[in-house]
């Protein structure tokens, strides 16, 4: 009998949620995703020292201004790690726009253009990149413009149906609803435990998946941020699932029978008129979990970006 991971791959595209090249070699995912926290973690792996040195040297060659060097080194490091990962996966790498730009559409677009340019200079076509943006109104609007340019986007930190609907209406290539972080909020709020079937994160992704398929949206649903393999098993059949190394290992060592739980609708109905900004903000604001977790997610990514910059600043000073 095939292990649980191999069975899951029959129904769902598996993505590695890591910057760790050894983990990617081990589990052979289709794609990989990174974020500021994962880049920070990867930057502390000894094997990546040369990638950091390259980013520092390149940044110094671009400008004499320390702030600009820091910005350049950070972007170049994320791209260097992405380029290494793309040597191992047949699909795409997701690279994230600085979380501090989450409420600035124009700066998010500019950062996306820069990342795409850096990948191109490294020999990587934009068809192998997903630009990650927070699912704020501004991030969604940035994605809408980038998609028109042929730059595909991964809308992340997604916790609500309002965000998911707006992303699809904007023509985003892919969304990353955060299953485990939704569960975290409800466990803390209610003091209850949830089995996988009733897990609020699983329920949310199932609702989004069904809505997309019923209304003919092409936006890919990629469940993210898992707390246990039960959540993953309940989302078998989802377009994609991005999974961290520890849970990939648990799936590989498990022998649970997998059946698809999410099945695309065979017929579609017309979608409603797109949400206006006012409607989006109101609907999103009505979901206290989503409001809390989006704000927290942006703050935490910004904190880890800051930690990475402290490390890079020390190296730039040498």
UniProtKB/Swiss-Prot annotation:
* Molecular function, one GO term: transaldolase activity
Among the Pfam families in the record, one is TAL_FSA
Which InterPro entries is this protein grouped with? Aldolase_TIM (IPR013785), TAL/FSA (IPR001585), Transaldolase_1 (IPR004730), Transaldolase_AS (IPR018225)
Catalyses: D-sedoheptulose 7-phosphate + D-glyceraldehyde 3-phosphate = D-erythrose 4-phosphate + beta-D-fructose 6-phosphate
The alphabetized UniProt keywords are: Cytoplasm, Pentose shunt, Schiff base, Transferase
Catalytic residues, per the record, are 132
- Identify the metabolic or biological route this protein is part of: Carbohydrate degradation; pentose phosphate pathway; D-glyceraldehyde 3-phosphate and beta-D-fructose 6-phosphate from D-ribose 5-phosphate and D-xylulose 5-phosphate (non-oxidative stage): step 2/3
This molecule's function is given as: Transaldolase is important for the balance of metabolites in the pentose-phosphate pathway.
Can you name this protein?
A: Transaldolase
Q: What is the species of this protein?
A: Shewanella baltica (strain OS185)
């Amino acid at each position: 009998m095939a292990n649980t991971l191999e069975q899951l791959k029959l129904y769902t595209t598996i993505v590695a949620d890591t910057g760790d090249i050894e983990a990617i070699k081990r589990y052979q995912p289709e794609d990989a995703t990174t974020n500021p926290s994962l880049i920070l973690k990867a930057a502390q792996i000894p094997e990546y020292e040369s990638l950091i040195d390259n980013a520092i040297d390149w940044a110094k060659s671009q400008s004499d201004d320390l702030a600009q060097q820091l910005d350049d080194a950070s972007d170049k490091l994320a791209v260097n790690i992405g380029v290494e990962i793309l040597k191992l996966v047949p699909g795409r790498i997701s690279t994230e726009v600085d979380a501090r730009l989450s409420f600035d559409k124009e700066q998010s677009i500019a950062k996306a253009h820069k990342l795409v340019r850096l990948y191109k200079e490294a020999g990587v076509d934009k068809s192998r990149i997903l630009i990650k943006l927070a699912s704020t109104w501004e991030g969604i609007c940035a994605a809408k413009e980038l998609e028109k340019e042929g730059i595909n986007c991964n809308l992340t930190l997604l916790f609500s149906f309002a965000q998911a609907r707006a992303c699809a209406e904007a023509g985003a290539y892919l969304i990353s609803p955060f299953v485990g972080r939704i569960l975290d909020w409800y466990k803390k709020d209610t003091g209850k435990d949830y089995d996988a079937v009733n897990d609020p994160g699983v329920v949310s992704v199932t609702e989004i998946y069904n809505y997309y398929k019923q209304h003919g949206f092409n936006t890919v649903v990629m469940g993210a941020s898992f707390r246990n393999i039960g959540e993953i098993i309940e989302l078998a059949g989802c377009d994609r699932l991005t999974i961290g190394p520890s849970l990939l290992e648990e799936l590989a060592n498990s022998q649970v029978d997998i059946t698809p739980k999410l099945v695309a609708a065979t017929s579609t109905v017309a979608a409603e008129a797109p949400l206006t900004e006012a409607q989006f903000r109101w609907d999103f604001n009505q979901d206290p979990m989503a409001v809390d977790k989006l704000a927290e997610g942006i703050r935490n990514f910004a904190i880890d970006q800051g930690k990475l910059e402290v490390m890079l600043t020390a190296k730039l000073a040498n």
